[in-house]
Amino acid sequence: MGRKKHRTIPAVEVYEKSDGFPMPTAPPMSPSRMDGVYPSHHVPPLHQAYHVQPASANHVPDQIARFNVIKPDRLAKRHNPQLYTKRGCTDVFCCFLFFVFLCGWVVVAGFGIMWGDPQRLIYPTDSEFRRCGVNLEGSYNFSKRPYLFYFDLTKCISYATALGGCQTTQLCVKECPSTYFSYLQLRTASVSEIQNKMKSVVYCTDDVDKTTVTTFQALQNLVQRGKCVSYTVKSVPVLQRCFPEAIFNAVDNVNNVLNSSNSLDYLKRTFGDDALIPQDIQITGQSSEVMKSVVEDQPVTHKVIHDLSQTWWQTLILIFAAGILSFIWTVIMRLLGSLIIWLSILIVLVALGFGAGFSWLKWNTLKTTGAIDDYSFHPAFDAYFEMPTTWLVVAIATSVLLLIFLLVILFIRQRISIACALISESSKAIGSMMSTLLFPLFPFLLHIGVFALWGSIAIWLASSGQEVCRLKETNGQVYNTSTKCDCTAKVTGCTYVGIEKESETIFWLQVYNLFAFFWLSCFVTALGDIALAGAFASYYWARDKRHDVPTFPVIRALNRAIRYNLGSIAFGSLIIAIVKIIRVLLEYIDHKLGKSQNKAVKWFLMCLKCCFWCLEVFFKFLTKNAYIMIAIYGKNFFSSAKDSFLLITRNIVRTVVVHKVAGILLFLGKSMITLGMGILSFYYFSGRWVVEGVPKVDLYYYFVPIVIVVIGSYFMADLFFDVYEMAVDTTFICFLEDSEQNDGSLERPFFMSEKLLEILGNKNDIPLHSK
């Protein structure tokens, strides 16, 4: 069959000695080589490096046939695309653009640091926007008042509104209330008792002089004006905010309700009712019946923490065991991958055949016994399966599926064999380069770093703004038109009024920051992919697998990518990042429109989101194959993407079969490892399996460590199988290139394994070593 040879080596180019492979020896009179680089017109002729038996003269070029011995392994190296391929910096403009963008990201971070203060998000603010627990020189000193107290929590709809600001007076306090109190208790109190309560349990705004409050009428007036609190409940600090303890502690909650003086209901019954005093049910949001049902219970969080503290080392051991099983599965796929695939196909055929046979038999039985069809509504769904037509439809459907599946298998059986052989070769590649299994830790750590950078900048930007202080007017009030003053200066009457924000500017800076996160994350992923692809490609194109594969193949491939291909990596990751940010903006627009959008707009947005999701999936597939071509030939991104896309479209059936077969194996591997570790952890943590010598653990919720083991096992398996998937994809692209560019002659030998040659019915004119 004719083969395209559009990748033949040009006549005059510069070739680099790469990965430690020996170059042919230069002739005595040739110019000196410099740093392992030769101009191609000084590369020594084949007859000076290789020797040929006279009997082979009819099968090799004339200039080789005059010599005695042929060394085909060395000859094959001349056609290794990783050795004799022109290498140079690719997509330099994109690389420059990427670094300019990173400089812009630094500028955005600088704006965030200049304008922002994360303490504004960490520390709560009172009704006058002053931060609790903070000392702002010249304005206020709340360093000894770290907690935020809400005058009336019933005006807060939810925790979210409480954290963001309730429509009630908020006050920074030294400590949260430790007792239940109603101002109605002081209706008949003496002056000394009122003054004592004002100091200890009554909270008022800072403009109230509590020492002047000596009568109940004065206190009632302040309460009605919102200057003093009408009640307090026993509270605990949560995120530096005071919340009723009853919400978090069921035991105390029940005790408060059941005829205890530690409740607002009791105080109302004893000292009188008032519209300003809520019921306990309004504060806690829980009924007394629910409280009673959990009277003997402890907080769930405490139990979960207890379970984790008791099982952390067993959990880590099981997750580590999942990693070992993942490695063992790669060995199993190497030895039994073909068997697993053909066995799966056989099981599907048998299942369809059994289903078809049973359905025809059931239809014949019902038809013979005189069963009738009645497809009116039946509450019992089983009634429809007592009708012959139902089984006739099922029989026809399963028979058609069986026939189609059988024809497809017969048509693509050779391609399935190729897929199995490629998977076996990928397993061999991983087995010979064990460092590939550890390499994903490197991009994983980089991803953590990128996420930390993005999160930090996002927090600084979210807290951006300028603190504004204004001078009080003659009437003691502060207005938006009042004169501004320096918050750090000790000026009489200078009052803190809030924070001014450039909302639109901050929004677009956040968009820039998010786009930087997407681009850099995709860049890190691409860098890891191209490094692994380079390592696996070096294995495929090595004739002698034991000697020609370079030492530290992943590090060499990573170095090659950083040295030459950063621009191409930036180009590919930029495409994915653009699609991602468009999808985020579409979600933002959808959220902003909310319920106001009509059905047409909603449908249009849904279509756009679906299209861009499909586009992202397609571009991820395209860029991944482009990175493999870059790792092999070192071309720019566009050329590599075009070559890989055309290569795949010319072999679309092979591509689909290989990806589906590999997907089945990887899915089976992930599922079996995750399911197996889940079952094992279930039997152990539930106490059904007792290990001799290992103390039995008593847990409140044994499903907690089981869930952690299952999730950890899945991610551990995914870590291994991502490498395996990259190995299969790279080996497949190399195989397609090998099939199209080589013909088995001495000048262009195949690099594929003997098994693949046998499946394709090809052979090399002179057998070359392939170990």
UniProtKB/Swiss-Prot annotation:
One of its GO terms (cellular component) is membrane. It is found in: Membrane. The keyword Transmembrane helix applies. Keywords: Glycoprotein, Membrane, Transmembrane, Transmembrane helix. The chain crosses the membrane at residues 96-116, 312-332, 335-355, 392-412, 441-461, 514-534, 566-586, 603-623, 662-682, 701-721. Glycans are attached at residues 141, 259, 480. InterPro entries: Choline_transptr-like. Its main location: membrane. GO terms for molecular function: transmembrane transporter activity. GO terms for biological process: transmembrane transport. It is a multi-pass membrane protein. Disulfide bonds: none annotated. Belongs to the CTL (choline transporter-like) family. PANTHER family: CHOLINE TRANSPORTER-LIKE (SLC FAMILY 44), CHOLINE TRANSPORTER-LIKE 2. This is Choline transporter-like protein 1. It comes from Caenorhabditis elegans.
